[in-house]
Amino acid sequence: MAGGSTGERPFGDIITSIRYWVIHSITIPALFIAGWLFVSTGLAYDVFGTPRPNEYYTEQRQELPILSDRFESKQQIDDFIK
């Protein structure tokens, strides 16, 4: 080992190994598929509590729900929800 070495494998050795590509050829596409399913099924809206695109405006309320008074924000939010 050279001076100052941490004893870890060099990055070049890692990315040129067969084992690296066998593992990552499965895990990287799986992560993309999992993310796509998370968003496309709407689970992301449920987990993070954000409104779905068709829930931003209701039939009764078509204006932008913008808070204008920070001290009365709770009351304004309650009015927007109604």
UniProtKB/Swiss-Prot annotation:
What cofactor does this protein call for?
heme b
Provide the primary localization. membrane
> What GO terms in the biological process aspect are recorded for it?
photosynthetic electron transport chain
Tagged with keyword Membrane: yes
Asked whether the keyword Transmembrane helix is assigned, the reply is: yes
The compartments listed are:
Cellular thylakoid membrane
Instruction: Name the PROSITE patterns for this protein.
Output: CYTOCHROME_B559 (PS00537)
Protein's membrane topology: Single-pass membrane protein
Q: Cofactor binding mode, per the note? A: With its partner (PsbF) binds heme. PSII binds additional chlorophylls, carotenoids and specific lipids.
Q: Which Gene3D superfamilies match?
A: Photosystem II cytochrome b559, alpha subunit
SUPFAM superfamilies xrefs = Cytochrome b559 subunits
Give the transmembrane region(s): 22-36
Q: Where does heme bind?
A: 24
Matching Pfam families: Cytochrom_B559, Cytochrom_B559a
What are the record's GO terms for cellular component?
Answer: photosystem II reaction center; plasma membrane-derived thylakoid membrane
Keywords attached to this entry: Electron transport, Heme, Iron, Membrane, Metal-binding, Photosynthesis, Photosystem II, Thylakoid, Transmembrane, Transmembrane helix, Transport
Q: Main role?
A: This b-type cytochrome is tightly associated with the reaction center of photosystem II (PSII). PSII is a light-driven water:plastoquinone oxidoreductase that uses light energy to abstract electrons from H(2)O, generating O(2) and a proton gradient subsequently used for ATP formation. It consists of a core antenna complex that captures photons, and an electron transfer chain that converts photonic excitation into a charge separation.
Which PANTHER family does UniProt cross-reference here? CYTOCHROME B559 SUBUNIT BETA-RELATED
Instruction: Fill in the subunit field for this protein.
Output: Heterodimer of an alpha subunit and a beta subunit. PSII is composed of 1 copy each of membrane proteins PsbA, PsbB, PsbC, PsbD, PsbE, PsbF, PsbH, PsbI, PsbJ, PsbK, PsbL, PsbM, PsbT, PsbX, PsbY, PsbZ, Psb30/Ycf12, peripheral proteins PsbO, CyanoQ (PsbQ), PsbU, PsbV and a large number of cofactors. It forms dimeric complexes.
Name by which UniProt lists this protein? Cytochrome b559 subunit alpha
Q: Which organism is it from?
A: Trichodesmium erythraeum (strain IMS101)
